[in-house]
Amino acid sequence: MIFQRTVKEMVKTTGVGLHSGNKVTLSIKPAPVNTGIVLVRTDLEPAVAIPAKADLVRETTMCTALVNDEGVRISTIEHLFAALAGLGIDNAVIEVDAPEIPIMDGSASPWVFLLQSVGIQEQASAKKYLRIKNTVRVEDGDKWAELKPFKGFRVDFAIDFNHPEIARSQQHMVMDFSTSAFVRDISRARTFGFMRDIEYLRANNLALGGSMENAVVLDEYRVLNPDGLRYEDEFVKHKILDAFGDLYVAGYAIVGEFCAFKTGHALNNQLVRALLAQQDAWELVSFEKDEAPVSFSVPTGAAVFT
């Protein structure tokens, strides 16, 4: 049987909020089976818990944000959620003392390192997968995203940016998901932005924590970061990373193929909502280890405790 996973013990880190520019402290704690991922705002009195559910994603401008019915929000969850999804962690309580998750280096890599360093604990209950039975598709102009049946988890993603540096890079990628492939090929891809947009955002008290330490920054012609790119195709890989995080608010690892063209946080969330609403399009399943359609084998050097 493939079992559910949580973190072996609590782990804590600090970073900077992308939009506020303020210091943020975050803790990831073990959680019982079938808890899912729950975020807690510890800076409020009393603390407010917000479960990671698709219908609580109520803000998708420049990031993915969970907002409860009282208006309490936790923003910029997507990179941390990509790491949780990539490592197959089903259950965790995430405590944060601010309205946003720290941006770290703009990728999922610091979260992967943090989670692997503390260890991953298998739990005494079967892991549930969301298997796609029928194709579900959403569109917005020329942008679209769909989930369709597939024996594993495959991503087929294309972007289309009219920028000389991005146009020179590979803007289309197909990958069959495994934890090893995610850690190696996707997790280090950083968010990217354009200098013209950053100047506008800062004038409006946004992206105050953004810098070349946590983003790939481009002017009209080139990448401005002195060290350049981490991958030749870092732009499309970061969009895939975002999608991994956005899809994880479905609550389960997906067995199916995710295909997308020019999609972002808003359309990713629309797809998850459309999928969950169409109950004949999916089913929850569990697997024996030798039947696993998706590999969550953690790379060498990281510990999984049984």
From Swiss-Prot:
Zn(2+) binds at H79, H238, D242. It comes from Shewanella sediminis (strain HAW-EB3). Its cofactor is Zn(2+). This is UDP-3-O-acyl-N-acetylglucosamine deacetylase. GO terms for biological process: lipid A biosynthetic process. Catalyzes the hydrolysis of UDP-3-O-myristoyl-N-acetylglucosamine to form UDP-3-O-myristoylglucosamine and acetate, the committed step in lipid A biosynthesis. GO terms for molecular function: metal ion binding; UDP-3-O-acyl-N-acetylglucosamine deacetylase activity. Its EC number is 3.5.1.108. GO terms for cellular component: membrane. Keywords: Hydrolase, Lipid A biosynthesis, Lipid biosynthesis, Lipid metabolism, Metal-binding, Zinc. The lineage of its organism: Bacteria, Pseudomonadati, Pseudomonadota, Gammaproteobacteria, Alteromonadales. Pathway: Glycolipid biosynthesis; lipid IV(A) biosynthesis; lipid IV(A) from (3R)-3-hydroxytetradecanoyl-[acyl-carrier-protein] and UDP-N-acetyl-alpha-D-glucosamine: step 2/6. The keyword Metal-binding applies. The gene is lpxC. The active site is at H265. NCBIfam families: lpxC. Belongs to the LpxC family. It catalyses: a UDP-3-O-[(3R)-3-hydroxyacyl]-N-acetyl-alpha-D-glucosamine + H2O = a UDP-3-O-[(3R)-3-hydroxyacyl]-alpha-D-glucosamine + acetate.
